[in-house]
């Protein structure tokens, strides 16, 4: 879980019998191209391995994994997406069997909460927010809109309902396309590697498909 919010509303939202939280402060190391000595001495990575009960790279043993679902939970903004990308890069390069076995997920926290009388909805983006603002929620009075700047701005009830309760949350399972595994590796290298010209080329090739940009 991203940030100090894990110490507050996150702990209040979890099921202590089945869910554990590991707070990560800031952006973790980009492991792609990093020396093994740097990986082995990185505090955040060591904490992560210890919490999961597994090693990295050739020392990874899927049988030692302590949890069935490893869920990356970050803020619903650009910085949160960057942290999620860094974590997925780490898991892809150092714990690939965990992904292949279907254990890695992304949480889908909302960006907005809309309330109208007794009616309440959570939405993930501006397009959905605008749709509800236009049509209304069906409650009484005006619509109250709150934007969550981060997970820490949610109270335990919000966080549980939207992100942590298995009966109401939304998760995205992280997978590798079995028909094009090499293409996945190439894409990770282009986006997360040490050659900025490859990232620039990717942006140039795909900028036409961007409809909304949060910067």
Feature names for model-found ranges:
Residues 1-215:
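Conserved phosphate-chemistry cores used by DNA topoisomerases
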């Amino acid at each position: 879980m991203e940030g100090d919010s894990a110490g507050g509303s996150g702990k209040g939202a979890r099921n202590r019998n089945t869910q554990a939280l590991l707070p990560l402060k800031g952006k973790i190391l980009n492991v792609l191209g990093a020396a093994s000595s740097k990986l082995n001495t990185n505090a955040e990575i060591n904490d992560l391995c210890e919490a999961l009960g597994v090693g990295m790279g050739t020392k990874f043993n899927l049988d030692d994994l302590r949890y069935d679902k490893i869920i990356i939970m970050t803020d619903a903004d650009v910085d949160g997406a960057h942290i999620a990308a860094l974590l997925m890069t780490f898991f892809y390069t150092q714990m690939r069997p965990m992904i292949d076995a279907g254990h890695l997920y992304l949480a889908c926290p909302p960006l907005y909460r809309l309330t109208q009388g007794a009616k309440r909805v959570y939405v993930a983006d501006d397009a959905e927010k605008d749709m509800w603002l236009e049509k209304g929620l069906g409650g009484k009075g005006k619509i109250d809109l709150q934007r969550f700047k981060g997970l820490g701005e949610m109270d335990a009830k919000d966080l549980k309902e939207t992100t942590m309760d298995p009966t109401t949350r939304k998760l995205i399972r992280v997978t590798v396309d079995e028909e094009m595994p090499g293409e996945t590796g190439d894409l990770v290298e282009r986006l997360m590697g040490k050659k900025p010209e490859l990232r620039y080329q990717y942006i140039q090739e795909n900028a036409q498909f961007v409809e909304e940009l949060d910067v």
